[in-house]
UniProtKB/Swiss-Prot annotation:
Transmembrane segments: none annotated. Residues 21-286 form the Tyrosine-protein phosphatase domain. This is Probable tyrosine phosphatase protein J2. Belongs to the protein-tyrosine phosphatase family. The keyword Transmembrane does not apply. The gene is J3. It catalyses: O-phospho-L-tyrosyl-[protein] + H2O = L-tyrosyl-[protein] + phosphate.
């Protein structure tokens, strides 16, 4: 079923967000996309999908099966889904605590997909359930069954940390890996700084574009985004990328359409109202800064 075209021109979008009743319209739009019983139920939704795969049951939507991530060995990577960008198939892999139970499988997924950028969109330093696969000490190597991961350099910025890594397989083949961790995602999931997230996003976007321009080992793999807190932070990143790419190419955008496309690939995603509203704040901030729009009175 085709997605309804709800795209807006840049000026129309900016004027819409600045209207006094824009928030109520955004909430109404969100409610039309996300069923009420699904709101905030990300963890249970993903568990349901994984259980269905384990039992070889048919999923409610067949396309979800095609978006799951398999290794070359045909093993499934639980809670990992391919997500398309704007006119870019499988630009992302979205995961939830993917290396929590099997770090080797997670690293194999990165290797098989030629991943060179890993992103964590929420702070996890204090999370007990996060299994960090690299060392926090520079020039330190951690050895797993099938891989070694070396921490080369840790670069700390005001709202994110960039860790430069080298992933080496059993044959001694090595690949560089850049890990970006966003450290400014608010604990309340609401008090965001759009400029901080945009700066984080564009640092990643710039590196990805540079890697594609100067690729040395085949096609650059998907950007892998690992969400730790079971919120929609990883989907916020994808929706932002889809919308900004579309507006640069066409001069139009639709957050609703972008969210629907992501939800076609990842069951139960973007099911927190705060995160949906944040997408509007992000894109409004970007457009206002980029086009230097004077506030309409």
């Amino acid at each position: 079923m085709p997605i309804e075209d709800k795209r807006m021109r840049i000026m129309d979008f900016i004027n819409f967000v600045r209207k006094p009743d824009s928030l109520s319209c955004i909430i109404q739009e969100y409610r039309a996309i996300v069923p009420e019983q699904e709101d905030g139920a990300s963890k249970s939704c993903n568990q349901a999908v994984n259980r269905a795969q384990d039992e070889n049951n048919a999923l409610p939507i067949v396309r979800l099966v095609h978006s799951r991530v398999n290794l070359f060995s045909k093993e499934k990577v639980m809670s990992a889904r391919y997500v398309d960008g704007y006119n870019h198939k499988q630009k992302f892999i979205i995961t939830i605590n993917s290396c929590e139970n099997n770090t080797d499988k997670y690293l194999q997924m990165l290797w098989d997909n030629n991943v060179q950028i890993v992103v964590t969109t929420s702070s996890h330093a204090e999370k007990n359930n996060f299994n960090r696969f690299w060392s926090l000490n520079e020039r330190t190597v951690i050895t797993y069954n099938n891989f070694q991961i070396e921490t080369l350099e840790i670069i700390t910025k005001p709202h994110f940390v960039l860790t430069l890594l080298v992933l080496t397989d059993q044959k001694g083949q090595a690949r560089k890996l850049s890990h970006f961790q966003y450290t400014a995602w608010p604990a309340d999931g609401f008090s965001h700084d759009p400029k901080a997230f945009l700066d984080f996003f564009f640092n990643i976007d710039s590196l990805y574009a540079d890697l594609r321009k100067h690729k040395t080992i085949g096609n650059v793999g998907p950007i892998t985004i690992d969400c730790i807190d079971n919120n929609s932070s990883s989907e916020v990143f994808c929706v932002l990328d889809i919308c900004l790419t579309e507006v640069k190419k066409t001069g139009m955008l639709s957050i609703a359409n972008a969210v629907k496309k992501v939800r076609q690939k990842k069951y139960g995603c973007m099911n927190r109202l705060n995160d949906y509203v944040f997408c509007y704040h992000l894109i409004h901030a970007y457009l206002s800064m980029t086009f230097d729009i004077v506030k309409v009175r």
